[in-house]
Amino acid sequence: MKSLETKLFDHLAFLYGEEKAPTITERFLRLLKEFRAKHEELVISIPSEKVSERDSILITYGDMVTKEGEAPLKTLASFLEKYLGDVISTVHILPFYPYSSDDGFSVIDYRRVNSELGGWEDVAALSKSFRLMFDAVVNHTSSQSAAFQGFLKGDPDFQDFFTVVDPDIDLTRVFRPRATPVLTPFETAEGTKHVWTTFSADQVDLNFANPDVLLEVADILLFYAANGAEFIRLDAVTFVWKEIGTTCINLPRTHRIVQTMRTVLDMVAPNVMIITETNVPHEDNIAYFGDGTNEAQMVYNFALPLLTLHAFHNADVSILSDWAATLDLPSDQATFFNFLAAHDGIGMLPVKNILPLEDLSDLVARTQSLGGYVSYKSNEDGSKSPYELNINYLDALSDPDEVKKGIDHLDELNINYLDALRNPDAPENNIELIAKRFLATQAIMLALRGVPGIYFHSIFGSKNWTEGVEQTGRHRTINRQKVECVQIEAELNDPTSLRHHVFTGYKKLLKARMSNPAFHPYGAQEILSIQPSVFALLRTSLD
């Protein structure tokens, strides 16, 4: 069996060539030696399981719940301890670093906490009650970061940190997750340069073809481990390696980058788990497991949200069940990160070749009829196609025909729609029914093999925040509402509220999962075929 040091050399030789690999490897080893000396406690591998049926991960922004005069991270900690301390093991704080756009995903400084949220002491306080998951937003950095500002000023240390491309070069094969140009012109000390920007003009891609970039990213990951991260989410990692003439996603060197990160952590922080966020077709997504021991310990199960939504809209679980039957694990060291909702929209690309195009079109139309939005991406031929559905998952389950009937009836009676929400007899205002329907989807996610990821607005029964979209002009804001602590607590304590019904029901599901070893993330799973309207599975404990 190869030593981890040998594996590290092999990865770096694959990425940068045999000639450069010895020098680059030596630089990595110096970094790891220094880290090991400072953090001996992290080097000790805990023999017990890293995750079990008792684990679930709450996904939240650091300021999702606020209280006047208090640092949001402090408010979040006390709120979560009070309401979820007995059912949630881990908190995934979405990017809490200083940023310039995209709600945190355009990082200015990876090693600081956004002062508007609190400080590292608040993160440490949260870690006393929960395990922590951090974001590594390392495909790109903010145009306001010190590195990119240095690049613009001609600082030689940063000239190769970003990918500069001649705008006349044909980039039509490059996969685009957005409808924006892949290159953005910037004025530098040396004139205009066109720089690679996968997601927006403010999010400038890092150049991993430069080993200095990978070394810096490795140092950032180790910094996160030293500050309490037991799980690290690699945001948009599928885009990190660029090769002109290819799609620039899921390339062999992309996987080697992830494998290098895994090896680095295995060498000095072996209890930290990597979770890859790769919003791509299912077969490409699960490739980030590697051989089951050398890449991500968990991958986002991106096809699950839309397939579950499709099953409920069509009252037919056949496609969902057939797909779920293929969810094999490559080893006893890797499993799925199951989720139905998060801060982003519901991805459509993961179900490519699983759902018929007609069904996808129906889901798009249904989302729009329910007050949601659709975000588009550019295609190779210049056309655009739906990339994600932007809608709260609870609202996405509604019946648009019933909603329309209700609105039409209100118009006839000259009743304001918001006032009518108080009418429990309206088909789409039956709170108990809405909660049960929503919890049925969550039960599927919680029962499947893997570790559940639960979005804040799911467990607390939120709905579309259309006012937020109007405020920001961004579709994703519909599912990113920040709530005042006093308001949400009042609703949670009101037995007639939707939040109360969803929250109390969700906690019952989590307690049932936690108490049964059959729901272990690595336990056996068999999908049962009973009838099209019933999703059934058999879970078996490891022993």
Residue ranges of model-derived segments:
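Acidic/aromatic-lined carbohydrate-recognition and catalytic surfaces
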Residues: K2-N210, L214-L215, A226, V237-F312
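Short alpha-helical segments and helix-capping/turn motifs at coil-helix boundaries
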Residues: V43, P72-L80, G118-E121, M133-F134, ...
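A structural motif
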Residues: I88, A229, G450-V451
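Hydrophobic residues within beta-strands of alpha/beta enzymes
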Residues: V91, I232-L234, I454
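Alpha-helical packing segments of well-folded alpha/beta enzyme cores
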Residues: G119-D122, L126, V213-Y224, I257, ...
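Glycan-recognition surfaces
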Residues: P156-D170, Q259-K384, D408-N414, N479-E484
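An active-site-proximal structural segment forming one wall of the substrate-binding cleft
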Residues: N210-I232, A325-P330
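Loop/helix patches that line or flank the sugar-binding groove of alpha-linked glycan CAZymes
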Residues: P330-D543
